[in-house]
């Protein structure tokens, strides 16, 4: 190799290594969104399922409900199983729910989410 080719190779390698230092892999939590498509909390009725999105212990309606999310709540998405997403309440009414523990995390049906970012 000539001196110019060696210098060019070293320069290219240095550039690749410098860019790699800034490349951060996507991690859980890089996907966020909001609850959409559920009735407003003014129409809340836990008995009939109105005005909230059920947070469940597993990815399906057959799993136990242990929390609620409400229209406009901000969520972080951590996992996906088909149409079901594992989410964490970040802000909104879910921090002070009508039923269940504050800031719930668990599985919700994806039809009621508007999400973006690097998602599972």
Region locations from a protein language model:
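Bacterial N-terminal signal peptides that target proteins for export
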Residues: 2-13
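N-terminal cationic leader/targeting segments used for protein routing and processing
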Residues: 5-6, 46, 63
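SH3-family beta-barrel domains
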Residues: 25-57, 69-71, 78-81, 112-120
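Boundary regions of SH3-family modules and the immediately adjacent low-complexity/disordered segments
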Residues: 29-39, 64, 88-120
């Amino acid at each position: 190799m000539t001196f110019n080719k060696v210098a060019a190779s070293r320069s290219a390698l240095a550039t690749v290594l410098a860019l790699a230092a800034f490349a951060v892999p996507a991690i859980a939590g890089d996907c966020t969104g909001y609850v959409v498509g559920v009735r407003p909390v003014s129409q809340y009725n836990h008995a009939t399922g109105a005005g909230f999105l059920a947070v469940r212990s597993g990815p399906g309606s057959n799993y136990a409900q242990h929390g609620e999310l409400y229209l406009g709540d901000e969520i972080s998405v951590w996992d996906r199983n088909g149409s079901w997403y594992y989410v964490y309440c970040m802000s909104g009414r879910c921090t002070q729910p009508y039923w269940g523990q504050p800031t719930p995390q668990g599985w919700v049906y994806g039809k009621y989410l508007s999400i973006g970012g690097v998602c599972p």
